[in-house]
Amino acid sequence: VERVIDGPTAEKLHCRILAEGANGPTTPDADRVLDQRRDEVFLIPDILCNSGGVIVSYFEWVQGLQRLFWSEDEVNNRLKILMTRAFAKVMHRSAKDGVSHRVAATAMGVERVQAAKRARGLFP
């Protein structure tokens, strides 16, 4: 459900935490409002909040490739470790650079892609 939180909606939010479980649920106007309200509304941006599904898909791929089977508990534990680590890194980067959680998460993602391309080349 994309772009359902626009500027006026973001101004009216009464939540303490906005965890974006969908892809792109906020408009750029809403993002500006949420950045101004960051002391009131703690934003967990979509790029971070909903990455668990992608991570678990990767786990499935690894298990299939290596003919492994992880229990549900093992998958959940591995997911918790990665999500907790990513959350901490985004929060640290946001505080260090004085930017929103979304800007921090996006910058970190772009930097990781850039590093991978540098290491492997454009067409591996």
Q: Each predicted region: which residue ranges?
A:
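Rossmann-like NAD(P)-binding element
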Residues: 1-5, 10, 20
